[in-house]
Curated annotation (Swiss-Prot):
Its EC number is 3.5.4.13. It is an enzyme of class 3 (hydrolase). InterPro entries: dCTP_deaminase, dUTPase-like_sf, dUTPase_trimeric. Belongs to the dCTP deaminase family. The gene is dcd. This is dCTP deaminase. It comes from Gemmatimonas aurantiaca (strain DSM 14586 / JCM 11422 / NBRC 100505 / T-27).
């Protein structure tokens, strides 16, 4: 399994639409950086958010998640309440090749402020906008800046294609648009 370089990421995005829209350089001036980097791609967070609220005093159940537990918000800056989280989506649409798996890690700029981004791996032949989970681990409100970097995606090629890809099994998050809540 090999880690993929900026050249590979750029070629796959330009020739095969792996990342759209694709930023072929790292944009850094006055923003939290995004775009291609040496061995990854810093994706951006879009303007649509679902901010968790516990006004219903409910139990969080991934098998029966109540959509009323979220407040929908659209804007350039999202305020995540203390010790809470928000769901968001990427600006970029991803199409993962059959022999590739990705891992995603949060940006250090946010992590150093107690803001953690979680994303599960993009499996072979998965495609869609990425649903991001953004946790504010601090006792204070935290700002998230739309259309700026939120997490870095690193791409790994397998030594051979999988027998069954995410696309083959018609995974439940295939082709997702918008912020997608848990599905069973």
């Amino acid at each position: 399994m090999g880690l993929c370089s900026d050249r590979w990421i750029t070629r796959m995005s330009r020739e095969h639409g792996m990342i759209e829209p694709f930023e072929d350089r790292q944009v850094r001036q006055g923003v939290i950086s995004y775009g291609v980097s040496s061995y990854g791609y810093d994706m951006r967070v879009a303007r649509e958010f679902k901010i968790f609220t516990n006004v219903l005093s409910s139990v969080v159940d991934p098998k029966a998640f109540d959509p009323k537990s979220f407040v929908e918000f659209e804007g350039d800056v999202c305020i995540v309440p203390p010790n809470s989280f928000a769901l968001a989506r990427s600006v970029e649409y991803f199409r993962i090749p059959r022999n590739v798996l990705t891992l995603t890690v949060g940006k250090s700029t946010y992590a150093r402020c107690g803001i953690i981004t979680n994303v599960t791996p993009f499996e072979p032949e998965w495609e869609g906008y990425v649903t991001l989970e953004i946790s504010n681990t601090t006792p204070l409100p935290a700002k998230i800046y739309a259309n700026e970097g939120i997490a870095q995606v690193v791409f790994f090629t397998g030594d051979e294609p999988p027998e069954v890809s995410y696309g083959d099994k018609k995974g439940k998050y295939q082709g997702q648009h918008g912020v997608t809540l848990p599905r069973i």
